[in-house]
Each structure stands twice: as structure tokens, then as C-alpha cells.
Amino acid sequence: MDIDQARLTHLQQLEAESIHIIREVAAEFENPVMLYSIGKDSAVMLHLAKKAFYPGKPPFPLMHVDTTWKFRDMIALRDKQAKENGWDLIVHVNQDGVEAGINPFTAGSAKHTDVMKTEGLKQALNRHKFDAAFGGARRDEEKSRAKERVYSFRDKNHRWDPKNQRPELWNIYNGRIDKGESIRVFPLSNWTELDIWQYIYLENIEIVPLYFAAERPVVERDGMLIMIDDERILEYLTPEEKASIQTRKVRFRTLGCYPLTGAVESEAATLPEIIQEMLLTRTSERQGRLIDHDSAGSMEKKKMEGYF
């Protein structure tokens, strides 16, 4: 560590590293895109991209792969932010999946995720010919992400081979790819969940209200508290489940498709309270994602098939 780095706080060091990665990709690749999932990590990543190119706008579009089952608050914030900031926002929906009636209930979490997220993402990347895609994944989230490089190389079919990763020495990244290949880039790789929350607090970044504890209607399914976000879910609940719907004070540590995302009971209704809760928690935020529990090593299998 040099003298200049020693003067930085750990969050400033993480910020500088992430901005360096974002600028490196923008300079090195012909057609990058930033995936915007509307969660807390995406909010931080986008904030860093805005800083990286201030006073100009980021020189790449944002893209949201919409499964049609996202929380309404997520879509509202996405549209509000895009309008206020004048972003070039691409929203892609896998229409083949919609026409086939794929949903989290009748198709199951694994097939729904594969068709509406993985295949939807691959469709969008192919259609727009993106050669690099930024994502907000962090190494502390899940074991398969812990061994993934900042530059995650994908073959012509968007598949990831965990045994064929390039070395990354210091801040030197090898972005050479053949025609048809691409990379997924993770500028937040070295951040932790606590780092994310502290940075959101310090930088006053707007996030989805679902991260804050509030009274919300929930039903217990598969050992998880699932929020009743709209009426579509009601036709898939059993009479017993409908009778057990209750209002509890809950929040979300992670956000995805609402029927596949579990809430946690919490009193943390402000950013300082969330940070305090993070200091005491001993569980991963990904425990609230049903797709991570489909089978042993399910996340790694999904990533090898093209999942982000």
C-alpha cells in the first residue's frame, strides 16, 4: 500500500478500485452495458459509474432483464430514476417465456429462473451484441461467487468455466476476447454487505423502500415469508395459505422475483438501524433467495449455464 492509499478509508479504497474497473472496461471494450437489477448493489454500482464519468453520463446503456414478477416498488424506482437521470435504459422480457406461461409457481423456481432470467439475459446480450456486462455481484454473497474473478469470461454460449479463469495480478486485467466471446464484470467483488450499506448511508443513495422494515402482508411458504405484492399470487395459494396471510413487520435483505424472495422480521426502519443489524447478523443475505436452494451447488450450475 502506498502513502496515498494509506490516507484513504476502506470505503474510499473500495470506491477507487471500483471506479478504476468501470473506467478500464469502458476504455477496453467496444460495446459494454451495465445490468441494473434495481437492488442495493446495483444502486451502488450505478452511483460509482456516475462518479467515474462525472460531469458526463456513463458511456454505456443500462439494461434490466424483467421477469414480470419483480416487486412493484422496484419497477417504480427503476422508471423514476431513468426519467430523472435521462438514462439510456433497455428493458428486456423473454417473450417466449411469457407466451409459454412460465411463472414461479407452475414452472418452479429453477425453470422460471432459467427461462426468464438466464435465457432472457442471453437473448438481450446477443440482440444488442454487448461484449462486456457489468453486474453488482459480490464475493461475500455466495460460495460460487467467492471464486469468480472481477473479469469473468464467457464463451460464445455465455457459459462460465470456473476451471478456466485468468489470473488477475494487482489491478491488471486481461480483457482480450475472441469474436463472440464476452465478459461479465464485477466492480463490487471486494465489497461486503456491510460496506454496501455504509456507502449507501454516506453517499445518500436512493434505494427501494422494501429494504426498510414496515408492516407488510406475508404468507409462509417453504419456510420463507413471502410478501403478497399483487393479486396474481393469490390463485396459486392453497386455502390454508390464504387463511394464514398476516401482517408482519418485515424487510428484505435481497430483492428478486417476489414469489422467490423471503422477507425477514426486523425493526430496522432506517439506514443506521440496518447497519447495526448487519453488525450483529450471522446469516447470508442469499438465504432469502429460493433459487439458491434448488440443489447443491445450484448457483454455480446456473452461472455455468449463463446466469449472471
From Swiss-Prot:
One Pfam family matching this protein: PAPS_reduct
Coiled-coil parts of chain: none
EC number assigned by the record: 2.7.7.4
GO process terms (BP): hydrogen sulfide biosynthetic process; sulfate assimilation
InterPro entries: PAPS_reduct_dom, Rossmann-like_a/b/a_fold, SO4_adenylTrfase_ssu, Sulfate_adenylyltrnsfr_sub2
Reactions it catalyzes: sulfate + ATP + H(+) = adenosine 5'-phosphosulfate + diphosphate
GO molecular function: ATP binding; sulfate adenylyltransferase (ATP) activity
Signal peptide: none
Pathway: Sulfur metabolism; hydrogen sulfide biosynthesis; sulfite from sulfate: step 1/3
Keywords: ATP-binding, Nucleotide-binding, Nucleotidyltransferase, Transferase
Class of this enzyme: transferase
Protein family membership: Belongs to the PAPS reductase family. CysD subfamily.
Subunit structure: Heterodimer composed of CysD, the smaller subunit, and CysN.
HAMAP family linked to this entry: Sulf_adenylyltr_sub2 (MF_00064)
Function: With CysN forms the ATP sulfurylase (ATPS) that catalyzes the adenylation of sulfate producing adenosine 5'-phosphosulfate (APS) and diphosphate, the first enzymatic step in sulfur assimilation pathway. APS synthesis involves the formation of a high-energy phosphoric-sulfuric acid anhydride bond driven by GTP hydrolysis by CysN coupled to ATP hydrolysis by CysD.
PANTHER family: SULFATE ADENYLYLTRANSFERASE SUBUNIT 2 (PTHR43196:SF1)
Protein name, as recorded: Sulfate adenylyltransferase subunit 2
Natural source organism: Chromobacterium violaceum (strain ATCC 12472 / DSM 30191 / JCM 1249 / CCUG 213 / NBRC 12614 / NCIMB 9131 / NCTC 9757 / MK)
